């Protein structure tokens, strides 16, 4: 029997989405623009990184060919290897949102065919009746924010007032999301999670995809920083996913990082929490050791998106990609005959783009393992082909969406 390891490099888009203009994202290309900045010396940072973007392991697995097929060009300054060792291609999202749940659910074989609810950009973001009900049920004196904002910016701006007043900081973005920032000590982590749980229930009727708890510490705007205790409160996927189908067949799904939250803890056998890409890779390697025949290890590497993409930090994103690439040999060493590794992404978040939100892009699809024959799979229509390929590899019945490339 076989095993599968699915790694989502959160927001690592490769450009070229045919519908990008409808989202205001025409020309967005996370990989391509990072490579351009690196090649031009604009992503050098003392003590962190310098020079052209260097991803030798992913390049040997077909990343350069993926970039060209998705966006029409090779990334600047990056050598194209003579030989490729993996299955490689790109995928075009068919779900309407460019958000985390839509991308992950579609990867797991369940595209999102409906429109999420969103909050208005102008004026107060949240309905007054919702805020009144939430404050009443949570017994808080009110909220701060009530707007679209960058998380780090709004914590710096309102964090001190939050500590003085006890009012949680509530904000949103272009995603279908209600985010709540609160101090872990002054407000309390348990109280923050309870507040978000109440919000989740009240927002179901508004069709909001996620409520996110964003705890932070520090005593002033200059010292505030988020902690690793983030939690996402998601709605359930609209139909059974690959994860549910595996559980039904008696398999185990090892959810590393925020995967459990993204799937509302449905179709999950084991949750392994870790904070930061390095710790997430360590946890993934441990999960690979624990995985039995027929199991899936599913990891989200969130730093690319949360720390570097949204904050438009090109050197940081480049360094994180290089660090991830350098860890891939650790994965290779763990592989047994019958194992399959898949590397992909859920959307883009071009750190050179205007604003702070996700960008509509195609995503890379890399698959490799012992005995896997290298070949191009072209540009796939829909991420669900990834989930269906894993289903076929693990020997479970096909689902209603997608087509295996194996």
From Swiss-Prot:
<keyword id="KW-0479">Metal-binding</keyword>
<keyword id="KW-0963">Cytoplasm</keyword>
<comment type="function">
    <text>Isomerase that catalyzes the conversion of deoxy-ribose 1-phosphate (dRib-1-P) and ribose 1-phosphate (Rib-1-P) to deoxy-ribose 5-phosphate (dRib-5-P) and ribose 5-phosphate (Rib-5-P), respectively.</text>
</comment>
<dbReference type="GO" id="GO:0006018">
    <property type="term" value="P:2-deoxyribose 1-phosphate catabolic process"/>
</dbReference>
<dbReference type="GO" id="GO:0043094">
    <property type="term" value="P:metabolic compound salvage"/>
</dbReference>
<dbReference type="GO" id="GO:0006015">
    <property type="term" value="P:5-phosphoribose 1-diphosphate biosynthetic process"/>
</dbReference>
<feature type="binding site">
    <location>
        <position position="10"/>
    </location>
    <ligand>
        <name>Mn(2+) 1</name>
    </ligand>
</feature>
<protein>
    <recommendedName>
        <fullName>Phosphopentomutase</fullName>
        <ecNumber>5.4.2.7</ecNumber>
    </recommendedName>
</protein>
<feature type="binding site">
    <location>
        <position position="358"/>
    </location>
    <ligand>
        <name>Mn(2+) 2</name>
    </ligand>
</feature>
<dbReference type="GO" id="GO:0030145">
    <property type="term" value="F:manganese ion binding"/>
</dbReference>
<dbReference type="InterPro" id="IPR017850">
    <property type="entry name" value="Alkaline_phosphatase_core_sf"/>
</dbReference>
<dbReference type="GO" id="GO:0009117">
    <property type="term" value="P:nucleotide metabolic process"/>
</dbReference>
<dbReference type="GO" id="GO:0000287">
    <property type="term" value="F:magnesium ion binding"/>
</dbReference>
<dbReference type="GO" id="GO:0008973">
    <property type="term" value="F:phosphopentomutase activity"/>
</dbReference>
<dbReference type="Pfam" id="PF01676">
    <property type="entry name" value="Metalloenzyme"/>
</dbReference>
<keyword id="KW-0413">Isomerase</keyword>
<dbReference type="InterPro" id="IPR006124">
    <property type="entry name" value="Metalloenzyme"/>
</dbReference>
<keyword id="KW-0464">Manganese</keyword>
<feature type="binding site">
    <location>
        <position position="305"/>
    </location>
    <ligand>
        <name>Mn(2+) 2</name>
    </ligand>
</feature>
<comment type="similarity">
    <text>Belongs to the phosphopentomutase family.</text>
</comment>
<dbReference type="InterPro" id="IPR024052">
    <property type="entry name" value="Phosphopentomutase_DeoB_cap_sf"/>
</dbReference>
<feature type="binding site">
    <location>
        <position position="310"/>
    </location>
    <ligand>
        <name>Mn(2+) 2</name>
    </ligand>
</feature>
<dbReference type="InterPro" id="IPR010045">
    <property type="entry name" value="DeoB"/>
</dbReference>
<feature type="binding site">
    <location>
        <position position="347"/>
    </location>
    <ligand>
        <name>Mn(2+) 1</name>
    </ligand>
</feature>
<comment type="pathway">
    <text>Carbohydrate degradation; 2-deoxy-D-ribose 1-phosphate degradation; D-glyceraldehyde 3-phosphate and acetaldehyde from 2-deoxy-alpha-D-ribose 1-phosphate: step 1/2.</text>
</comment>
<dbReference type="GO" id="GO:0005829">
    <property type="term" value="C:cytosol"/>
</dbReference>
<feature type="binding site">
    <location>
        <position position="346"/>
    </location>
    <ligand>
        <name>Mn(2+) 1</name>
    </ligand>
</feature>
